[in-house]
């Protein structure tokens, strides 16, 4: 669209032109002979009127704003508002007038919205309201947005540093990450109750509590640190036209930051013009109506499309940015897989230049319609977004194999072998050597002898009596409970590590199969994907409050028992004080269990007490066994020292 054209002002012919290079923009009319010049500052215009399309006359009227400070009083003492200044232009061409009118509408609308925003800010400052950052704003052909000098997202700080993921997920960092632990406790009510009973009420150190839940912390940290990666932000922004030739755009602060990150040319245009040439809302209004916006979005730019004079200057600069990106993304490709390079180097296959009808995006005159440039721009943006993720989630450590141990390298090779596509490889065929056996005459048997031996085996008494079965079971249980010592099963650490590795490999394979086949790993059966929260509990004769007390006491006892065996079986002398504290906690657990049994017996009767005792008897026996082991080793140590 044109920004200039022939117009008549005060019955004098001339040329009217809109100058957007200055701030604020100006409309200048100059007579044909150059003697008369009339300039209108568009920021002072309040209304724009035009004759309808059905009228033979073609005129534009610009009505200026009324200055409230210049009110005056008449002879009767009443305040009289001064008349606004009017500018009338006549045209001889309907197309020229429509183009000028549309340009003036957009410019005047931007200034009016900026005035509304300034008035709103003045009211807020007068009312002494602190300005809070907005989660999203509406850019309406110049609607202001919060200033972006110090951007702050409302999502909050991440719980871990994803750029250094290996370091953030280490045991030391997880044990000292209090925010991560607090977030996990807030989201898991059951774990929160266990934490209150064991750490807050019973005095278990928090480091001990979390030391057995490192995998849980690590999984929670990974699940909460997931974030949206880079994407084509401009493709999600859709300007919507409204009344008064305004364009409404919903633009959040996060999208603005993503635009600056993915499109450096937009950030450069922003820093060059805000607040030097115009305010931030006017910048976004100009940007969304510019050709640069349509180009970055992946749309074709037609010759008749109207853009923005200032923002569209960065189109040529954007080409320089594209060339720099191409050089940065350029990487060598071997000729054995560079098919495009092979075709270009083959003169026989390539032949003469294809006809213009076979060239993509080129007309008969050899002019490009921009399709290839759009595709190249989208590919360039995709590569940049992928390159932006190379430092996220410790991807840079994948190529650094200097610190990888043999076991980790073997696991890495196993995973790579699983990912290989071996469908086209030749399958290995086993070749067997045929061996012919010759029997002697005295070793040959007849068919009748074979039948008789089979009948004798079939008729044999293979039944096992109940007494024999009970004897065998008691023998196995006696060996497992009294004679088997798990500490002496694998005395060599090397053998233990190999066995652990085989077990972990088997678990991985079974887990993949179970996930694929929807198999419950605990029951070994096919299950539905229904949530466990919807499952009904097993019926119990105990009241709900008593049952919940038994559960919490059982969980607390198991927690202390687990930590006791971890330190007790370590064999380290420096753990003696910790084992002593845990031993005292186990003694307290025994007292709490006995108190609960006695309270239930006195308050609810013998039958209820028997049920409660049956529930908690296994954990009581386990704690008693642990305390007996500690007393035994403690007495043995004292006797040896004496």
Curated annotation (Swiss-Prot):
Residues 129-143 have a biased composition (Polar residues). Residues 65-76 have a biased composition (Basic and acidic residues). Signal peptide: none annotated. It comes from the Eukaryota. The keyword DNA repair applies. Coiled coil: none annotated. GO terms for molecular function: phosphatidylinositol-3-phosphate binding; phosphatidylinositol-5-phosphate binding. The keyword DNA damage applies. Residues 165-221, 243-295 form the BSD domain. Component of the general transcription and DNA repair factor IIH (TFIIH) core complex, which is involved in general and transcription-coupled nucleotide excision repair (NER) of damaged DNA and, when complexed to TFIIK, in RNA transcription by RNA polymerase II. In NER, TFIIH acts by opening DNA around the lesion to allow the excision of the damaged oligonucleotide and its replacement by a new DNA fragment. In transcription, TFIIH has an essential role in transcription initiation. Component of the 7-subunit TFIIH core complex composed of XPB/SSL2, XPD/RAD3, SSL1, TFB1, TFB2, TFB4 and TFB5, which is active in NER. The core complex associates with the 3-subunit CTD-kinase module TFIIK composed of CCL1, KIN28 and TFB3 to form the 10-subunit holoenzyme (holo-TFIIH) active in transcription. An additionnal subunit, TFB6, plays a role in the dissociation of the SSL2 helicase from TFIIH after transcription initiation. TFB1 interacts with XPC/RAD4. XPC/RAD4 recruits TFIIH to the NER machinery. Interacts with the NER 3'-endonuclease XPG/RAD2. Present with 5150 molecules/cell in log phase SD medium. This is General transcription and DNA repair factor IIH subunit TFB1. Belongs to the TFB1 family. Pfam families: BSD, PH_TFIIH. It comes from Saccharomyces cerevisiae (strain ATCC 204508 / S288c).
């Amino acid at each position: 669209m044109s920004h200039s054209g022939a117009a008549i002002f005060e019955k004098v012919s001339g040329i009217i032109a809109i100058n957007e290079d200055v701030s604020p923009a100006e409309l200048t009319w100059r007579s044909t002979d150059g003697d008369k010049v009339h300039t209108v500052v568009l920021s002072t215009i309040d209304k724009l009127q035009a004759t309808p399309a059905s009228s033979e006359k073609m005129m534009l009227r610009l009505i200026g704003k009324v200055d409230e400070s210049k009110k005056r009083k008449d002879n009767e003492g009443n305040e009289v508002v001064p008349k606004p200044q009017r500018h009338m232009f006549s045209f001889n061409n309907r197309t020229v007038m429509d183009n000028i009118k549309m340009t003036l509408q957009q410019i005047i609308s931007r200034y009016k919205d900026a005035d509304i925003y300034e008035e709103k800010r003045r009211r807020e400052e007068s009312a002494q309201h602190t300005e809070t950052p907005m989660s999203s704003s509406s850019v309406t052909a110049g609607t202001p947005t919060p200033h972006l000098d110090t951007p702050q997202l409302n999502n909050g700080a991440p719980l871990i540093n994803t750029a250094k993921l290996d370091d953030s997920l280490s045991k030391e960092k997880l044990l000292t990450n209090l925010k991560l632990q607090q977030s996990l406790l807030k989201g898991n009510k059951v774990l929160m109750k266990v934490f209150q009973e064991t750490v807050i009420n019973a005095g278990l150190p928090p480091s001990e509590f979390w030391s057995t839940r490192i995998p849980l912390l690590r999984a929670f940290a990974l699940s909460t640190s997931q974030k949206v990666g880079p994407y084509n932000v401009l493709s999600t922004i859709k300007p919507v036209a409204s009344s008064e030739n305004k364009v409404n755009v919903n633009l959040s602060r996060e999208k603005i930051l993503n635009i600056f990150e993915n499109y450096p040319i937009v950030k450069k245009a922003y820093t060059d013009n805000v607040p030097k040439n115009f305010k931030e809302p006017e910048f976004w209004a100009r940007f969304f109506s510019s050709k640069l916006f349509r180009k970055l979005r992946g749309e074709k730019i037609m010759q008749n499309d109207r853009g923005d004079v200032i923002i569209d200057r960065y189109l040529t600069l954007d080409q320089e940015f594209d060339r720099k990106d191409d050089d940065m993304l350029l990487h060598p490709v071997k000729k054995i897989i560079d098919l495009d390079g092979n075709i270009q180097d083959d003169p026989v296959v390539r032949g003469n230049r294809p006809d213009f009808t076979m060239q993509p995006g080129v007309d008969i005159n050899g002019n490009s319609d921009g399709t290839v440039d759009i595709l190249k721009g989208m590919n360039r943006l995709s590569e940049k977004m992928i390159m932006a993720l190379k430092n996220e989630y410790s991807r840079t450590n994948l190529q650094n194999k200097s610190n990888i141990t043999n076991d980790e390298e073997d696991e890495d090779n196993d995973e790579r072998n699983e990912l290989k596509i071996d469908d086209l490889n030749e399958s290995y065929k086993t070749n067997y050597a045929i061996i012919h056996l010759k029997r002697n005459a005295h070793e040959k048997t007849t068919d009748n002898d074979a039948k008789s031996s089979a009948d004798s085996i079939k008729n044999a008494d293979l039944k096992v009596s109940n007494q024999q079965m009970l004897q065998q079971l008691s023998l196995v249980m006696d060996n497992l409970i009294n004679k088997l010592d798990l500490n002496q099963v694998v005395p060599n650490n090397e053998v233990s590590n190999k066995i652990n590795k085989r077990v972990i490999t088997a678990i991985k394979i079974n887990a993949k199969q179970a996930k694929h086949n929807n198999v419950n790993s605990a029951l070994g059966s096919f299950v539905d994907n229904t949530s466990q929260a919807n499952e009904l509990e097993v019926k119990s004769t105990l009241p709900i409050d008593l049952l919940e007390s038994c559960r919490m006491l059982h969980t607390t006892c198991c927690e202390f028992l687990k930590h006791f065996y971890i330190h007790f079986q370590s064999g380290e002398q420096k753990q003696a004080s910790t084992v002593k504290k845990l031993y005292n906690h186990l003694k307290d657990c025994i007292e709490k269990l006995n108190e609960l049994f006695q309270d239930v017996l006195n308050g609810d009767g013998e039958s209820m007490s028997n049920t409660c005792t049956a529930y908690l008897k296994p954990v009581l026996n386990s704690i008693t066994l642990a305390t007996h082991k500690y007393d035994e080793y403690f007495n043995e140590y004292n006797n040896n020292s004496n």
